[in-house]
Amino acid sequence: MTRGTLNFVTSPMNAGKTANMLLRARHAATLGRRVLLAKPLSDTRHESSVIRSRCGIEMKCDLCAGPEFSFTKDVLYGDVDILLVDEAQFLSSRQIDELREVADVHGIPVWCYGLLTDFKKNLFEGSKRLVELCDKMIELDIVCYFCKADGRFHLKYANGKAVVEGPSIDISIPGDGKFVAVCHMCWTEKTSTSEEVQDPRVLCAKVIPVDR
């Protein structure tokens, strides 16, 4: 049996994680591999039947995983060659354990894409468990909105001011409307002053054109 792997691709918002995942899915499909695309039910930015990147690439979502969903009990993997999971930071530790089991027992590659930390610099539950269990972790680069250094952290703003309070999971409006990627020095500076953030816009990674 082919040995499966659990892989974690992570970056701050707008570095191209979902686009990267969908490009991987399309490439796998062109090679005749049977692809299963999944995302958490808590990702309500788009309809549950679609996974869509900010650059416009989209594909059909095969399953949405709610809190009680089991990747080991609720899915038959006989016709699956590769499993790709978007927004994996929203999964529970148990579900990440199950994805590890899927890779080991069924011998298929599992690719999880998601944020590493929230805007308070705390690991998400799913991301923490992925770091502990994954075979390979890949970080996509994005630059700091303010100084153009590596932007590994998130700055959340409300009414033009940086904030460090509130729930870690906040999808009331699209994430690129309230978060920017920043370096640690800029995160510290902006959260320790009352300076207003003018026209906050995230700098996106370079997008590769794809025929739709």
UniProtKB/Swiss-Prot annotation:
State the Gene Ontology terms under molecular function. ATP binding; metal ion binding; thymidine kinase activity
Which controlled-vocabulary keywords does the entry list?
ATP-binding, DNA synthesis, Kinase, Metal-binding, Nucleotide-binding, Transferase, Zinc
Cellular component (GO) terms are: cytosol
Task: List the active-site residues.
Answer: 87 (proton acceptor)
UniProt-listed InterPro entries: P-loop_NTPase (IPR027417), Thymidine_kinase (IPR001267)
E.C. number(s) listed in UniProt: 2.7.1.21
Q: Which domain of life is it from?
A: Eukaryota
UniProt binding sites for ATP: 11-18, 43-45, 86-89
Q: Which GO terms describe its biological process?
A: DNA biosynthetic process; thymidine metabolic process
Instruction: Decide whether keyword Aminoacyl-tRNA synthetase is in the record.
Output: no
- The reaction(s) this protein catalyses: thymidine + ATP = dTMP + ADP + H(+)
* Name under which the protein is recorded: Thymidine kinase
Q: Which organism is it from?
A: Encephalitozoon cuniculi (strain GB-M1) (Microsporidian parasite)
Question: According to the entry, what is the taxonomic lineage of the organism?
Answer: Eukaryota, Fungi, Fungi incertae sedis, Microsporidia, Unikaryonidae
Name of the gene this protein is made from: TK
